[in-house]
Amino acid sequence: MTATTITVQGTHIAWYDAERATVEISAAFDGAKRDEVFARATQTAADVTAEITPLHSPDAGPITWWSSDRVNVWSERPWNNDGKRLPLVYHATIGIRAKFNDFEALSRLVEKLAVMEGVNVGAITWDLTDERRKTVTDDVRRLAVEDAVQKATAYASAAGVGTPSVIAIADPGMLGDGSGGGIGPAPIMERMAFKAQAMDAGGGAPLALSPEQIQVSTSVDVRFSTP
């Protein structure tokens, strides 16, 4: 009896709790005098780093890593509603990033910085530790292959042929017959946005950050042969 070839794509999606959070902070000012704008930005950035440095410990946290950009200063001449050029306006901004392993400490810092003049708290990126990321990536890949085996076994049973044996495994699209597609060759780690519950107008409830889980997904093409 002629062997039957079965080619399927296995997929797996898993969700994991975030273990790290990186917050983006900036000190930004603008005005008519370059030196004044520069000085305000650098002083405010120094005030922010003064809040960060006592919290920094690579091993213990709550801040495991942080960095600060050089000050960026530029100018522009805006237009008014009548189409006339206005005097120069100078802008200065300094970016700061900090990675946390303690989300309550992150909430407290964000709450404190949010009321500082010239300070903007931007995106918060949620992630896993490097070690955890490698572990879950291996798990997701293994489960994607198991999904492919289950599919091929079901197809073989429905077709009335023998138990399928693996003859090729590849990232999507690499089996050479155009059978790929799908999610992609490498596990995709989707870092979901955070939810924040800010203080009410009376200042009663503290800021609470609630990270969504991180999605890790992958696909694999597997070719089987049946007797």
Give the ranges of each region predicted by the language model.
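Short, charge-dense linear interaction motifs
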Residues: 1-227
